[in-house]
């Protein structure tokens, strides 16, 4: 992770590849802690500012995918001014504020779904 491009490649591998290859299973989220660790390192080194604007979000998605409100807040701060990213970030953050987790992950992670979460999911609740 010596370069912005190296960080980008690593974070796509850790964050996006599992989400697309192991959809619906716990494996989809297995590398999230590593992705978040490396995203923190990349941002600390301002690597997210060194990639093309269209690619920047791939360096930041581990914050948006985290179930910790602090990471959600950090994502929102990092994408401030980008209306499209702010829109999606708000959907993620609002879900964490409301439930403390992403209910659409419950089945894959073997978590019990609360009645409020089930109602949210039944109404088409955010599943990003």
Region roles according to the model:
Residues 1-9, 17-128:
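Surface/interface-facing alpha-helical segments and adjacent flexible terminal/loop regions used
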């Amino acid at each position: 992770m010596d370069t912005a491009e190296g960080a980008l490649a690593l974070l796509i591998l850790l964050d996006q590849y599992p989400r697309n290859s192991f959809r619906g299973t716990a494996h989809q989220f297995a590398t999230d802690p590593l992705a978040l660790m490396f995203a923190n390192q990349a941002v600390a080194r301002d690597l997210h500012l060194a990639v093309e604007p269209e690619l920047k979000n791939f360096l930041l998605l581990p914050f948006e995918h985290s179930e910790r409100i602090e990471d959600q807040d950090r994502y929102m701060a990092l994408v401030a001014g980008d209306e499209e990213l702010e829109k999606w970030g708000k959907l993620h953050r609002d879900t964490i504020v409301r439930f403390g987790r992403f209910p659409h992950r419950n089945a894959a992670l073997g978590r019990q779904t609360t009645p409020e979460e089930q109602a949210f999911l039944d109404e088409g609740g955010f599943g990003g």
